[in-house]
């Protein structure tokens, strides 16, 4: 976060985005760096996923944050190779880009936490054969926008505790595909790894900065020399 940023917070209505909005709203009142916050909730009309918009608006207003609701939809038949989760996520992201531009924002803040990032790392390794995940800061030059994930070092357990303390309301309807995704499976994998080694999450996180190319069965990339 930098001086004079105007940040759009993707407010889904889940505990993570509610926590992120509160934390950024409170942080914006500190003198340096000076930045402003806008909350945006995207309604995907063709997905049976619903949040209490009155609650979200009142919550944002209680924090002194402007609130925007944007409705959109997508046709899953246009690309049957992609899962509904991927198509929904991508179209929500595009909607956030649109709202961000309309609101004069230069950054979009998403509520992903450390658990999300590690689960994505495990998913990409398992299903994509790629050592990659969601970066804390991603410059999207095509859209002239930067995505940030300010809670990248926060544990989901801490956010659950915050949600209980604040009394955050739960979704009216959860996503119908939520339990069918690989993410729910990887959440269990991460829990099992931590049962074997309580420091497993820190080891996984550290591995992203400790890639020993000469100890891997792959050809060395000359650009890394």
Predicted segments, located by residue:
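ATP-dependent adenylation/nucleotidyltransferase module used to activate substrates
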Residues: 1-122, 127, 157-165, 215
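Catalytic subdomain that performs nucleotidyl-dependent activation
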Residues: 36, 107-108, 115-195
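Residue-level signal for alpha-helical context at structural boundaries
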Residues: 42, 74, 136, 181, ...
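Generic structural signal for well-ordered, non-membrane alpha-helical segments
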Residues: 49, 89, 179-182, 197, ...
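Short, basic, helix/turn surface patches
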Residues: 91-103, 137-143, 190, 194-209
């Amino acid at each position: 976060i930098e001086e004079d940023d105007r940040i759009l917070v993707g407010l889904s209505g889940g505990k993570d985005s509610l926590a992120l909005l509160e934390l950024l709203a409170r942080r914006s009142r500190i003198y340096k760096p000076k930045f402003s916050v806008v909350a945006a909730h995207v309604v995907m009309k063709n997905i049976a996923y619903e949040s209490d918009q009155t609650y979200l608006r009142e919550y944002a207003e209680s924090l002194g944050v402007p609130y925007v609701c944007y409705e959109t939809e997508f046709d899953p038949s246009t690309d049957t190779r992609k899962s509904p989760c991927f198509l929904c996520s991508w179209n929500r992201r595009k909607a956030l880009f649109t709202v961000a531009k309309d609101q004069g924002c230069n950054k979009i803040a998403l509520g992903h936490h450390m658990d999300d990032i590690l689960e994505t790392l495990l998913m990409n390794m398992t299903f994509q054969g790629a050592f990659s995940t969601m970066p804390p800061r991603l410059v999207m030059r095509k859209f002239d926008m930067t995505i940030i994930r300010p809670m990248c070092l926060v544990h989901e357990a801490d956010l659950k505790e915050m949600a209980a303390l604040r009394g955050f309301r739960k979704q009216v309807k959860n996503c119908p595909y939520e339990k069918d995704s690989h993410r729910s499976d990887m959440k269990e994998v991460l829990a099992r790894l931590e049962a074997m080694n309580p420091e497993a999450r820190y080891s996984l996180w550290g591995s992203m900065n400790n890639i020993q190319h000469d100890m891997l069965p792959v050809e060395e990339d000359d650009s890394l020399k």
